[in-house]
Amino acid sequence: MSEKHPGPLVVEGKLTDAERMKLESNYLRGTIAEDLNDGLTGGFKGDNFLLIRFHGMYQQDDRDIRAERAEQKLEPRHAMLLRCRLPGGVITTKQWQAIDKFAGENTIYGSIRLTNRQTFQFHGILKKNVKPVHQMLHSVGLDALATANDMNRNVLCTSNPYESQLHAEAYEWAKKISEHLLPRTRAYAEIWLDQEKVATTDEEPILGQTYLPRKFKTTVVIPPQNDIDLHANDMNFVAIAENGKLVGFNLLVGGGLSIEHGNKKTYARTASEFGYLPLEHTLAVAEAVVTTQRDWGNRTDRKNAKTKYTLERVGVETFKAEVERRAGIKFEPIRPYEFTGRGDRIGWVKGIDDNWHLTLFIENGRILDYPARPLKTGLLEIAKIHKGDFRITANQNLIIAGVPESEKAKIEKIAKESGLMNAVTPQRENSMACVSFPTCPLAMAEAERFLPSFIDNIDNLMAKHGVSDEHIVMRVTGCPNGCGRAMLAEVGLVGKAPGRYNLHLGGNRIGTRIPRMYKENITEPEILASLDELIGRWAKEREAGEGFGDFTVRAGIIRPVLDPARDLWD
């Protein structure tokens, strides 16, 4: 489809100010170190406001009290969000205990937020605690480097507790890819870890002096689970196994979900299949994809800078041929693979290594001690006795991994007493939201705070129509940037204004089809009225095993998105 619309390999024109900022930053140093010592403001100023993102942080403020503080002639209550680099979501219990302590003692909100990028975030870090958080992470072998802005972000890997050997191999590749694509600048170590400046010239052989044109996301996925939502990502390595052993990857490039309301030059896009590669070429191919996007990505318009737009501009075959040239390989034909689901298997699963794995449902990934549900304390107690590790899933849940039979009852007791194993409906298990208000500066409508009561209402509709044992993949994102991955849901709500959302329908359960907007700028009662009617029809008219999204397409309720670059907005 893309070959009909070839365009220039490099977009000429005035570069965005972000490109100026990166070029002048002295390899991401800026004046962050000096800004840290400025006690007159709780935030970072000028270019540093954006540069700290390369160091894994976003400057935010509490939007619930923004107007009140403005009336009092006070600056916004600035605080940082920090996102950890955690390839594949694996974290040791020692590391967990350290982040639990920091969250409780040094953040405004006191919580740990699991994200659908398979890592954790701290919200509400005051400026005085910014350096200590990086030093705490370093002390337990973690960092926040390259988890935001124009770099390869946290690398995802399917959380598959059953196929323990295959997961271990895939996870190792996720770590290798993450390390290979990290920036080489010593700015992070100098600013946060007080490491000495080395008298050598900085070089960025892969990312370049101005880094990537836009954010870049990578996954390693183990079929038949598509829990990491590969089509939301720029570069995806689909594991191909023979006799339970990893032999190579299918490569898919150019997925991405972010759009802008009303801007038809923006669109969500599923990733394109490039071909199969043996394991030994993995890092060379990863580097070739990244450097091709580095050189060809649009640096004149950040809203059109991601890999998906580059593919559509130059053509899939042209981009693929350049990757082959740079990597020195020829892709083999795609090997067969299929996806059957995206959800986590909540509860106990026994692995082929005879260890047990307990997947805990964490609503919206928010770990905090609630009345009668001390989730944070419960997980801390488990971390103190568990000999295995924890694994954060791309569905914002947590796996207590590698539990021997002898420890199973002890861990289950703590989990149950802490409310970590409370029964939830299949619908709630398969619903997700981004953070949105009060901390996200881009939020247009509620998401995390909206979802629990919204799902109460959806559960009532499911019961009304006799489908309580079923689920619809349902997601809410507070703005069209799409962190909640609503643009791969069967039912996606995209925030438009306070209390109002665009309702998207027609995605599928396995995450391989983009949903289309069904109704625009509507309220929760209007959303529920529409879904009441549609769930009722699905319950009565569906075919055997037919998911809600597939039904809405087959029944003619919504047209499927076949070529999102050209028909998403039709």
Curated annotation (Swiss-Prot):
Gene Ontology, cellular component aspect: sulfite reductase complex (NADPH)
Molecular function as annotated in GO: 4 iron, 4 sulfur cluster binding; heme binding; metal ion binding; NADP binding; sulfite reductase (ferredoxin) activity; sulfite reductase (NADPH) activity
Main EC class the enzyme belongs to: oxidoreductase
Entry keywords, A to Z: 4Fe-4S, Amino-acid biosynthesis, Cysteine biosynthesis, Heme, Iron, Iron-sulfur, Metal-binding, NADP, Oxidoreductase
Cofactor binding note from Swiss-Prot or TrEMBL: Binds 1 siroheme per subunit.
UniProt: siroheme binding residues: C483
Catalytic activity: hydrogen sulfide + 3 NADP(+) + 3 H2O = sulfite + 3 NADPH + 4 H(+)
S-S pairs: none
EC code(s) of this entry: 1.8.1.2
Pathway in which the depicted protein is active: Sulfur metabolism; hydrogen sulfide biosynthesis; hydrogen sulfide from sulfite (NADPH route): step 1/1
Residue positions binding [4Fe-4S] cluster: C434, C440, C479, C483
HAMAP family membership: CysI (MF_01540)
Stored NCBIfam families: CysI, PRK13504.1
Function: Component of the sulfite reductase complex that catalyzes the 6-electron reduction of sulfite to sulfide. This is one of several activities required for the biosynthesis of L-cysteine from sulfate.
Protein name: Sulfite reductase [NADPH] hemoprotein beta-component
Phylogenetic classification of the source organism: Bacteria, Pseudomonadati, Pseudomonadota, Gammaproteobacteria, Enterobacterales
